[in-house]
Each structure stands twice: as structure tokens, then as C-alpha cells.
Amino acid sequence: VDEVSETLSPENSPNCMKKLLPAFPLTSSSSFNARRALVAAVAASPLIPALAQFRVEVSGVGLTQLPIALVPFKGQDAAPQKISAIVQADLERSGQFRGVDASGQALDEASRPDLTLWRQRTADSLVVGSITRLADGRYDIRFRLWDVVRGQDLGGQSYTVPQGDLRLASHRIADYVYEKLTGEKGIFSTRIAYVTKGGNRYSLWVADADGENAQAALASPEPIISPVWSSNGSQLAYVSFESRKPVVYVHNVASGQRRLLANFRGSNSAPAWAPDGNSLAVTLSRDGGSQLYTISSAGGEPRRLTQSSSIDTEPTFSADGSTIFFVSDRGGAPQIYKMGASGGAPTRVTFNGSYNISPSVSGDGRWLAYISRVGGAFKLHVMELATGNVAAITDTTADENPSFAPNSKLIVYATQLGGREALMTTTLDGKIKARLAGQAGDIREPDWGPFQKQ
């Protein structure tokens, strides 16, 4: 486990060069600039690297998992990161892959493997590659993916990266493999935001999807809650109590600059970005009780959406922007409702249980994740929106704040394990869970960021 992650900034992070590796043999091709984990601090505060990284622990067995062998990359023992191990951890965490023993083999992307051997080892797919340190200190990473069953070369890529981007390159490899073998986009190079509390100090963090490379965007002695990504991943909205009341800010991830969005009379809370990035839904008490409003992402006068004497809060948009799901106690207890994004008569969504909160809608529009109180325990549930079928998918008792991965295949949430708060990811059926166990304080309020442009 790395103790300190390298700080990346627009000034010190060189371009990450990627090349497509076509079918055997290798040929050269053009390069492009890959995404950088550029997280600057609020105002004049310096960017703070994580003091303790996460430890990924995967548990459970999926009903259908693709057996894949990842041969240790040639030369990786001399590198600061074990590329094949990172790729394998990513794929296993997705719940759709299981690792096959790849020991005793020495292969790289230029090798033509004996696929009969790998069939005997029950592998359906094979990843081989190499990593070489260049004279300028950067690393050249190359890999190739093989379909063992069909005997096909599925191509590969190469990356030339600085040391600080070795994990990013590994996540890109996992994305490539995942998409080639499942037909769905991989989420391993996306980011998550979350809040930690250590003593009397609160911090807002941005990290890779596996919890590594965490960088602090904000630290405060006052609570920070409700971080939420914009649809293009360039901004985070959040609520800060530094003014001795809840106020909504918008933070530019690349520059570290922030601006005040909502500081009206009373409480300003629960921001949610519209998918087009032009507006946000917020909960305000400026006119009395807590009601839902929309406000331009540039600020200005909010527009009221709900007109009730109850508490309406926790808005979240559907992926197409047409619908807002939210929590209201208008029926006597907190339940999840939905309405048009411009307002209108709400429709109740949840009926199982007397206390349902924290809605999150999947990007494909098929699923609703939320927290339901069951016999005094707070448990993560998933509803299929087309049928209304609901399933509890955790065995913990203090789950909070679910958020879907951008490919709708995983959920990140906060919970309590061993008396401490921690982040977990789970497949939608609850069969594969990964604990992201931090050591820097209680962890809460996760939000999974969108796909990034490559």
C-alpha cells in the first residue's frame, strides 16, 4: 500500500502518451493526451496528498465470472507499481472477472502464447505485457489481450507515462480489457469524491475509482457534506458549514478555484447537477420549510419547484434530465418521489418500508439505489424502476449515500464496519463487494464521477 500519492498539477504532470497496438505484429501509431488527475486545492491552500491510501478487499462470488489470466508484466519487478496486479484488482472488483493462476510464465506483448496451455488452465482470456523505464525517467507500458477460447488476438495499447501516472495507465488497461470482453465501458479510470472526518477536521477528497491517488480539495474545521460531480467531471458542488450555516459552493477541479452558488436565508443544501451542467437542483428553506429549487450553475435567483408544507430534499436527476427523484415526508414519513424536472405533481416511488432516503438513479435509467430503514438498520436497496421490484443487497446496518458508477454496473456507498465508517463498492446484486478501508478518519458522502474524455 502506498503511503503518499504523488501530487499532480497542470505544471508538473507531463502528457501521457497512448498508442494502439493493432493485431500481431506490433506497429506504431499516433498518440494523444490522456486524462490527468488534476485536483487543485480551494483558494490558496496547497494540494494535500493522502496520508493513508485505501486497501481494496474483494469478497463474494458472482454467478457468472469470466476467467482471465494476467501474466506479470515483463520488467514490472523493477517498477514502483505492479501493473498486472492493479489491472487484475480492477477487473475482479467489477464482479465480472475471476483471476486464473498465471504463475510460471514469462510472456510479453511481442510473444505469441501457447493458447492450448491457457485453455488447460481454464482461462478464457489472457493479458500479457511489459514495462520499461526510459532514459528520461518515464515508463513505456505495452500490453496485448488474447481470446483464449477463439484463439484471437484482440489487440492492445502502449502508454508512455511519468511515474505518477503508472496507476492511471493500469486503469486504462483494465478499461480496455473490460470493454473488449463485456461490450460495456470500463469505469476504472474514473474518480470518486468523498469526505473524511479526523478529529475536528473535515476534508473533501478526490481519488481514483479504487481509492488510490487521493488528493484533498478542501480542509475545514466545519462540516463538509454532499459533494456531487458535474456531468463532465470538471466541477464539484458541495455544502460547507464554514459560515456557521449550510452554504452551497461549486469547485473547479482543475484550477482549484471555487465560487459561492447558494447562500440564501436559512439552509442551503443537497445540490444535484442537471445532466447538461447548466443548472442544479438544491434544497432551500429561504421561504419557510425545506423545498426544492433549481438555480443556474452561474448563480442567480432560484426557481421553486415544490410547493408543500412538508420537507422536500435530496434531489437527483435522471440521466436524461427529464425527471427529479427526491425525498419527502409529505406522506407522514420519508419516502422517495419523482416529478418532472420543471416541477409538477410528484409521484411516489417507494412503498416497501416506512423510511426510504438517499436516492441515486443509474445512468442507464433502469435502477434506483436508496437507503431503507429495516428494523432499526439502514440498508442499501436497489429497485428495478420498470417493475418496482426491490432487493436489499447488503448485510451491514448503517449504510449511507449510494452512488452509481457511470456504467451503471457498480454502486459506491458508505457504511460502518468494525465501528468505523468506510467506503464499499458492490455489484447490483450484492454478490461482489470491495471494501475501500481508509485509515485517515471516518469516510462518508461518496459520489462517483462521470466518464472522462481520453
Regions picked out by a protein language model, each given a short descriptive name:
Residues 1-33, 37-47:
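N-terminal secretory signal peptides
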Residues 192, 236, 277-281, 321-324, ...:
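Hydrophobic beta-strand positions that form the internal "hydrophobic ladder"
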Residues 149, 208-212, 252-256, 296-300, ...:
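Short loop/turn segments that connect beta-strands within beta-propeller blades
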Residues 57-117, 127, 132:
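Short beta-strand->alpha-helix linker/helix-N-cap micro-motif
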Residues 111-176:
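Amphipathic beta-strand/beta-sheet edge segments enriched in Tyr/Trp
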Residues 185, 196-203, 219-222, 239-248, ...:
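A flexible loop/linker signature enriched in serine peptidases of the S9 family
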Residues 187-188, 231-232, 275-276, 319-320, ...:
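Residue-level detector of Asp-centered blade-edge/turn motifs that repeat once per structural unit
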